């Protein structure tokens, strides 16, 4: 498994001087280190994880966001048992995100497994912008408990102020 920290550090749980320096200078975050160590620990027990590349990690509240390559996201989402194992390892809610994705794709990852019908950027008279996302009523019922988390994650990670519009079926 490829991670933001070197393989030896991810396996041993301690940082070498090079990775320690990257952490100190801000090239790495504590979440990158934690995510790398936990996923490497899991990859020792599950060979499917060896093929993946973790680009970076972020934490928003109790939620852990793991940013992978686009091809890795599809693979992970097709393996429900593997996803459950990852969530157990991180002791909570894990969001799989595509690294370096444009805002629309970022929002699609947050709203997964439902589909976003429309997304529009609205410029308000006071100068700030709001992104409006449209979902169907049927889909909204699947994620209604997560909407506040989705809004908070979008705001903290990409500075997207989100407005969710629900359309009747």
Segments the model singles out, each with a brief description of its role:
Residues 1-169:
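RNA-contacting regions in translation and RNA-metabolism proteins
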């Amino acid at each position: 498994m490829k991670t933001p920290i070197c393989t030896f550090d991810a396996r041993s749980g301690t940082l070498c001087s090079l990775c320690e320096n990257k952490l100190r200078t801000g090239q790495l975050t504590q979440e990158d280190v934690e995510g790398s160590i936990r996923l490497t620990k899991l990859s020792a027990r599950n060979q499917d994880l060896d093929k993946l590349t973790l680009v970076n990690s972020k934490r928003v509240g109790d939620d852990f966001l793991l940013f992978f390559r686009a091809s890795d996201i599809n693979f992970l989402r097709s393996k429900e048992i593997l996803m459950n194992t990852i969530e157990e390892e991180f002791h909570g809610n894990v969001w799989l995100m595509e690294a370096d994705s444009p805002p629309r794709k970022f929002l699609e990852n947050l709203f997964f497994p439902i589909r976003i019908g429309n997304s529009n950027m609205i410029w308000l008279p006071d100068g700030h912008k709001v992104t409006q996302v449209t979902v169907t009523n049927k889909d909204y019922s699947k994620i209604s408990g997560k909407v506040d988390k989705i809004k908070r994650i979008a705001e903290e990670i990409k500075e997207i102020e989100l407005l969710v519009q629900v359309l009747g079926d």
